[in-house]
């Protein structure tokens, strides 16, 4: 249904229990808002870009079984009306969350309960997601290597992330650039001495007056 801009039919009766990839399934299906709440997604490994730019979509999918999914990159990117609960999702096998909520401009649901311990890429995850302002301090981020642009141009975020373990992250470029509401003390973050990019880390983060992390291998 990707780019099927007029499609908006019910798919509630579909048996998708053997489907392994739903990547880009409704990408740019700009009218779709059909009931898929009850889908059995136990075999799915990829939901990458599933609702990317699906600008009408706002259906509850919080009951889906996502325990086998490894890729959620760009899943709700540009899904500008989506604002449903996802906190009960099992994301323990997900590796890729880059751009997951980029430009998801009204999404502001708690996801602090997620087990993100296997995620390696969170780049651009909440960029331009201006409504999002939830605490994420319970996240175990020890596997993450890329947080570049993670909160870039997010004008609303000031959630608690002070307890994150960032010792494995090597790319923090523009992580908070243009995050004009953010103001947290991140002095306790342990920064990887092998960070390759921290340029523009806090560029135009105009509200941030509390302590930054200490970088030894690059200049912010």
Annotated model-derived regions:
Residues 1-220:
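Negatively charged
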């Amino acid at each position: 249904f990707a780019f099927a801009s007029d499609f908006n039919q019910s798919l509630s009766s579909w048996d998708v229990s053997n489907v392994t990839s739903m990547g880009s399934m409704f990408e740019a299906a700009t009218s779709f808002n059909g009931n898929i709440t009850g889908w059995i997604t136990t075999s799915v490994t990829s939901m990458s870009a599933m609702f990317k730019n699906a600008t009408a979509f706002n259906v509850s999918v919080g009951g889906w079984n996502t325990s086998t999914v490894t890729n959620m990159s760009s899943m709700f990117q540009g899904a500008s009306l989506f604002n449903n609960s996802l906190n009960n999702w099992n994301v323990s096998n997900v590796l890729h969350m880059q751009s997951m909520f980029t430009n998801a401009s009204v999404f502001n649901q708690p996801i602090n309960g997620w087990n993100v311990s296997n995620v390696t890429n969170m780049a651009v995850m909440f960029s331009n997601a201006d409504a999002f302002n939830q605490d994420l301090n319970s996240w175990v981020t020890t596997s993450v290597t890329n947080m570049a642009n993670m909160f870039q141009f997010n004008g609303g975020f000031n959630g608690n992330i002070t307890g994150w373990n960032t010792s494995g992250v090597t790319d923090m470029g523009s992580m908070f650039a243009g995050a004009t509401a953010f103001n947290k003390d991140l002095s306790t973050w342990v920064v990887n001495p092998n960070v390759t990019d921290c340029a523009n880390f806090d560029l135009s983060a105009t509200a941030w007056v509390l302590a930054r992390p200490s970088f030894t291998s690059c200049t912010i």
